[in-house]
């Protein structure tokens, strides 16, 4: 059974510069850490949650270790400077999945996300493998059952694989099937896709599903496509698989990208998403601290989380 645990206060530590000025604060001083999973007490805040699960990565024959991602990313975030928006962050702890119950873990995350959104919070989830996306996305669909939900994925992979059980490579096929079951449109856009990392069958599935696909080679000039997608939906779920970044910026993932989309381009793409007023949920997935020798990759990932919270409108 998937268990919930509050985040350890030891994760939120950093340098105290407050003697210099009242606004010389860092995230560890701005964030609120909750000892209970009580989203109803935190309306209009951003729920920071961890999904400590990499069973989907294991099933997908990837490199395990992403279950340690949430706490590693908290440590990297803690000492970053606090600016506008960061005071809204409330750490609502980790969902920890016992191997091999991926389906139970995804259901627990789904219920938690739906509860947060219905309570008036927004959700920022730290994975975990990209199996995070099915639980997170399903929770968003549940919470906004009468509205059109757009799923924006920055990823080298389409993650539309067809297998006999859920993996880190199946979340968007699962979400498509959930939309089918609910008789609602499946709005999915994937930016940063590597043609070399996706089979022809996956491209065919994406075409059949009317997925908006932008390859890694074209992301330098994709703002118009991003804006068009934002305009056609009511609510947005943003998911960032860190393997969208080039290996020289992000080696600490299951499948590092030989080409990838540089961090500066990723930030430019998500800027209008965060400022759109439609973003309800976001996550960072696939960070694997086992392959981060000096903490540099954690800082890259943390900058994305920091920027999302700062820009979020």
Swiss-Prot record:
Catalytic activity line of the entry: N-formimidoyl-L-glutamate + H2O = formamide + L-glutamate
Residues given in the record as Mn(2+) 1 binding sites: 130, 155, 159, 241
Entry note: cofactor: Binds 2 manganese ions per subunit.
GO MF annotation terms: agmatinase activity; formimidoylglutamase activity; manganese ion binding
UniProt entry keywords in alphabetical sequence: Histidine metabolism, Hydrolase, Manganese, Metal-binding
Residues bound to Mn(2+) 2: 155, 157, 241, 243
Enzyme class: hydrolase
The organism's place on the tree of life at top rank: Bacteria
Biological process annotations from GO: L-histidine catabolic process to glutamate and formamide; L-histidine catabolic process to glutamate and formate; putrescine biosynthetic process from arginine, via agmatine
InterPro entries: HutG (IPR005923), Ureohydrolase (IPR006035), Ureohydrolase_dom_sf (IPR023696)
Cystine pairings recorded for this chain: none
Annotated function: Catalyzes the conversion of N-formimidoyl-L-glutamate to L-glutamate and formamide.
Cross-referenced PANTHER family: ARGINASE/AGMATINASE, FORMIMIDOYLGLUTAMASE
Similarity-based family: Belongs to the arginase family.
The protein's name: Formimidoylglutamase
Species of the source: Salmonella paratyphi A (strain AKU_12601)
Chain's gene name: hutG
């Amino acid at each position: 059974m998937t268990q919930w645990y509050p985040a350890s206060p030891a994760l939120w530590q950093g340098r105290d510069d407050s003697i210099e000025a009242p606004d010389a604060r860092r995230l560890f001083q701005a964030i609120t850490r909750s000892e209970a999973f009580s989203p109803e007490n935190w309306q209009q805040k951003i729920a920071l949650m961890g999904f400590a699960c990499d069973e989907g990565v294991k099933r997908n024959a990837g490199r395990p270790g992403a279950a340690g991602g949430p706490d590693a990313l908290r440590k990297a975030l803690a000492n970053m400077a606090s600016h506008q928006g960061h005071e809204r962050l409330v750490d609502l702890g980790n969902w920890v999945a016992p191997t091999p119950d991926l389906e139970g873990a995804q259901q627990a995350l789904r219920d938690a996300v739906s509860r947060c959104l219905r309570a008036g919070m927004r959700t920022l989830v730290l994975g975990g493998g990209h199996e995070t996306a099915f639980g997170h996305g399903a929770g968003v669909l549940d919470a906004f059952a009468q509205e059109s939900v757009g799923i924006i994925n920055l990823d080298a992979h389409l993650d539309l694989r067809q297998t006999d059980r859920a993996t880190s490579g199946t979340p968007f096929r699962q979400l498509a099937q959930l939309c089918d079951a609910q008789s609602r449109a499946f709005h999915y856009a994937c930016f940063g896709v590597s043609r070399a990392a996706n089979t022809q069958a996956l491209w065919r599935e994406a075409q059949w599903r009317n997925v908006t696909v932008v390859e890694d080679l074209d992301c330098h000039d994709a703002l118009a496509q991003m804006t068009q997608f934002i305009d056609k939906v009511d609510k947005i779920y943003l998911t960032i698989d860190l393997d969208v970044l080039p290996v020289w910026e992000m080696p600490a993932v299951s499948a590092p990208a030989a080409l990838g989309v540089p961090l500066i381009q990723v930030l430019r793409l998500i800027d209008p998403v965060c400022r759109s007023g439609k973003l309800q949920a976001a996550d960072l997935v696939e960070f694997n601290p086992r392959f981060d020798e000096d903490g540099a990759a954690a800082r890259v990932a943390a900058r994305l989380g920091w920027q999302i919270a700062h820009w979020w409108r």
